[in-house]
From Swiss-Prot:
Organism: Klebsiella pneumoniae (strain 342)
Pathway where this protein functions: Purine metabolism; IMP biosynthesis via de novo pathway; N(2)-formyl-N(1)-(5-phospho-D-ribosyl)glycinamide from N(1)-(5-phospho-D-ribosyl)glycinamide (formate route): step 1/1
One GO CC term on file: cytosol
Residues involved in N(1)-(5-phospho-beta-D-ribosyl)glycinamide binding: 22-23, 82, 286, 355, 362-363
Gene encoding the protein: purT
Protein's recorded name: Formate-dependent phosphoribosylglycinamide formyltransferase
Domain ATP-grasp: start-end pairs: 119-308
InterPro entries: ATP-grasp, ATP-grasp_carboxylate-amine, ATP_grasp_subdomain_1, PreATP-grasp_dom_sf, PurT, PurT/PurK_preATP-grasp, PurT_C, Rudment_hybrid_motif
Binding partners and assembly: Homodimer.
Keyword set includes Metal-binding: yes
Keywords carried by this UniProt record: ATP-binding, Ligase, Magnesium, Metal-binding, Nucleotide-binding, Purine biosynthesis
């Protein structure tokens, strides 16, 4: 039975967020709703979740001893990773000593890099995936491309938001693709995955919750990617009953194999009735921000409810909804937002993340819309996002 203490009191229930971006901010808010003491950690100060947490710490989370020292200092009841770039071996050791890691330290370790989760999915669980090879050197990379064939995709085994990722159409792109992959890894230069191109009709994120009362599925989320990062997402994505059944079967296998309780973002390719596994995040997914307006329980509320050991019950989806990102390009440490009257209204909401600075292109907010159709919801969200004026 779950018992929650009161924040800032001796019996407080403490949650430590490792990673304090916009997704962590929403998780922190859901924890605050339940009176949970929230500690936000990231590699830079004033990150979004730090602005709504009880305490904040700035450390290099890839440095195992620094991470261990902070955890031993704060003594959280739950450690909740929000990003991949964490010293996961340290989390495994701490979990073995009794520390609770959400959903499990093994899940964090396997999904920290694309190799761990790809080998689990393709080789252990025998799920359908794209063809793939791994490489440690430029010579090995070129050999992998020859094996896979063109066109293909190369990604650092550890990166996010499209960093270091290239779509290779011809052999004269290989040197630049290798160089970019070595620059884009979250933990520095190193191993890459070369993937064959999958012919698909659309991509989905199947938000899957593993909780004390079983495995639950949100309605499938469709999304559009550009430069490796999402631009719009919508719910529900229309798909055949057979494809949805297959998608749920794949997602169930993956989350049960990873173990623990929480919400998982399972990314899948859909072609007709066929479904191919792509990736999984053992935490809320950026494309799932649409659930802030589309469901009675957002992906963040579901994640917190699940890892606290509370039942999820039924998830109510309200109908066609969409999100669109606010993605300006500028350099500033004093960003302001204008023309906001065009970004809010009936069935139209706005979230600004509070990121302290921007240097280039950065996702600073999202608009959320509901409508009578998915197409109309996407159009409303995109129009609202485009109307916001970002200055600094």
């Amino acid at each position: 039975m779950t018992v929650l203490g009161t924040a800032l009191r001796p019996a407080a229930t403490k949650v430590m967020l490792l990673g304090s971006g916009e997704l962590g901010k929403e998780v922190a808010i859901e924890c605050q709703r339940l009176g949970i003491e929230t500690i936000a950690v990231d590699r830079y100060p004033d990150a979004p979740a730090m602005q709504v947490a009880h305490r904040a710490h700035v450390i290099n989370m890839l440095h195992g001893e620094s991470l261990r020292a902070l955890i031993e200092q704060e003594k959280p009841d739950y450690i909740v990773p929000e990003i991949e770039a964490i010293a996961t071996d340290t989390l495994v050791e701490l979990e073995q000593a009794g520390q609770k890691v959400v959903p499990t330290a093994r899940a964090a370790k396997l999904t920290m890099n694309r190799e761990g989760i790809r080998r689990l999915a393709a080789e252990e669980l025998q799920l359908p995936t794209s063809s793939y090879r791994f490489a440690d050197s430029e010579e090995g990379f070129r050999a992998a491309v020859t094996d896979i064939g063109l066109p293909c995709i190369v990604k650092p085994v550890m990166s996010s938001s499209g960093k270091g990722q290239s779509f290779i159409r011809s052999a004269d792109q290989l040197s630049e693709a290798w160089r970019y992959a070595q620059q884009g890894g979250r933990a520095g230069a190193g191993r890459v995955i070369v993937e064959g191109v999958v012919n698909f009709d659309f991509e989905i994120t199947l938000l899957t919750v593993s909780a004390v009362d079983g495995v639950h599925f949100c309605a499938p989320v469709g999304h559009r990617q550009e430069d490796g990062d999402y631009r719009e997402s919508w719910q529900p994505q229309q798909m055949s009953d057979l494809a949805l059944e297959r998608a749920q079967a794949i997602a169930r296998k993956v989350v049960l194999a990873l173990g623990g309780h929480g919400l998982f973002g399972v990314e899948l390719f859909v072609c007709g009735d066929e479904v191919i596994f792509s990736e999984v995040s053992p935490r809320p997914h950026d494309t799932g921000m649409v659930t802030l307006i589309s469901q009675d329980l957002s992906e963040f509320a579901l994640h917190v409810r699940a890892f606290l050991g509370l039942p999820v019950g039924a998830i109510r989806q309200y109908g066609p909804a969409a999100s669109a990102v606010i993605l300006p390009q500028l350099t500033s440490q004093n960003v302001s937002f204008g023309q906001l009257q065009s970004a809010v209204g009936a069935g139209l909401q706005l979230r600004l993340f509070g990121k302290p600075e921007i240097d280039g292109t950065r996702r600073l907010g999202v608009t959320l819309a509901v409508a009578d159709s998915v197409e109309e919801a996407v159009a409303r969200a995109k129009t609202a996002a485009a109307a916001v004026i970002v200055e600094g």
